[in-house]
Amino acid sequence: MFALIYICAIVIGKIKFSGTEKQQPSSLVSETDNLKDSESNFVEEETERSTQKTAEEQEIILEKETTSESLQTETAESQQTDLVNQIDYALEKMTVEQKVAQLFIITPDALTGISGVSAAGDATYAALQQYPVGGLVYFENNLQSYEQISEMLHNVQQYSIEISGLPLFLAVDEEGGTVARISGQGYGIEPIEDMAAVGASGDYERAQEIGTYIGSYLSDLGFNVDFAPCADVLTNPANTVVARRSFGSDAALVAEITDLQRKAMEQEGIIGALKHFPGHGATSEDSHQGFAYIQKTEEELMNNEWIPFKKGIEEGAKMIMVGHIVCSEITGTEDPSSLSYYMVREILRQKMGFQGLVVTD
């Protein structure tokens, strides 16, 4: 480039005389044009090389990203295969009685035969040897202080792993608001407002914050399962069972909030259980006191009460709690959904596609 400018300057200088510019000879014009053409060709070649280099660099980056994604996929598949192999190996070693025991999540009181169990010691160890259950759920009479809860859960988890090689589901009902075994109970955990208030505010960010908060302190204590959030759509205004526990009567809002809260808990290491399928918000009775009834068709429920559950299933929910709720319009029987093959297998598993863990209320 500098050579071209220098030559052009000499040529122009030679054809000037007394301030008057003379006509350039044709030979000089031709030489200048040739130089310009050469420079233009050079620039085009450099641009082409640069473009080609950029394309090659982008291709290399893309190949690296593809390779990285492929390796991540292979690693995930390998880990999944290893996990399946471990499960198969564990099942092969178990007796029928041990396999049946793994299907139960019970209270520590039921496990040991002792009322108000608040520690995991020799009695708990002996009971787990005889009944290696799949999990334990804790209530107010088992909980006394932050330190006591933490030590109890740590010990019982260690016992289970030592005895069966399998960890326990350690569960609690911690919805926040009116149903809270930990927050607001004097363990240094601040209380949380009713979920009805959260739903009424429409504050998705607050719902997510609550999920993170609950998940954080439960995980710190040693729990790994929370029988929450409440995915019931409050479609019966006379319902008092979940009136303050439900996020509201708008199925779409309930679906979004429960999903956000569940995911937030899972980020903290807590499995959330969507409850109470097929929907306690449509009942008037309390299923803890007896059977509760839903007088709706399958289509009606699918288009309303089941929307939060469908959302959760699509988004990867790991656990759903089925209530003792009779849907005679669908099943033609008085069997509660918790014991109904049709409600669990035909609807929840097959029609709705849930492949996670189903637990009863």
Predicted features and spans:
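Second-shell loop/turn segments in exported
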Residues: E77, Y89, A110-S115, G135-S145, ...
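Conserved beta-strand positions in the central sheet of alpha/beta enzyme cores
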Residues: I105, V137, D226-F227, A273, ...
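Short glycine-enriched loops at secondary-structure junctions
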Residues: D109-T112, V172-Q185, N224-L234, L274-H280
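N-terminal hydrophobic targeting/anchoring segments and the immediately downstream early-domain regions
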Residues: F2-D33, E39-E46, E59-L170, E174-G184
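A substrate-binding/cap region within the structured catalytic cores of diverse enzymes
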Residues: E193-F223, A228-A251, T258, R262, ...
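Short, acidic/polar
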Residues: G113-Q129, A207-I214, M302-P308
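Second-shell residues forming the walls of enzyme active-site clefts
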Residues: T95, S115-G116, A120, S145-S164, ...
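Substrate-binding cleft of extracellular glycoside hydrolase catalytic domains
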Residues: L168-G211
